[in-house]
Amino acid sequence: KVMQSDIPIIRLLSVAPWVVLIVILTITTNFTSRPIWRLLRWLNPSLYPDLNGTWEGEIILEDGKAIPARAVIRQNLVQAQIDLHTKTSKSLTLETTPVIEAGQCKIYYTYRSQPSNVKWPSYTGSTILDVRNSAIKKTTPLELSGYYFTDRKTCGRISLKQTSTKTDVEVSYY
């Protein structure tokens, strides 16, 4: 026999999984998280910018040689993924952490790079990318730049500019 006081608990237990599912889908899919992000940024422009999109730029090696680079950034309210491609390698995200330090937006980015030549070993790298122009003008494209360091004991500079807000674009060179 079910007591009258147990009925609200039973209702809560039958509704709670659906509420959790809706919340998870809302914060993890671009379909819902990007409009929420746009609204929140409209209400408070100092919030972290939406980095979703296609990016182009260059990687400057420690010897000064510049290599063209393209990237796609996919970001939702929970995580960010950066796929960075050059003619000689492609880098996949191991970890990203967006932060705001002293009013400056940054993204801590750790990646594994796979060279196009299968005889070359893969390597990992890390960089702190500064996010620029996010609060200056809405018409100015966002820019990312920072120094990188790899476990091969190499270093250099990454510089990217957002060319589109589309994330379903192929940026691979090979």
Residue ranges and their predicted role:
Residues 1-46:
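N-terminal alpha-helical membrane-insertion module
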Residues 38-174:
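Central antiparallel beta-sheet cores of small beta-barrel/beta-sandwich binding domains
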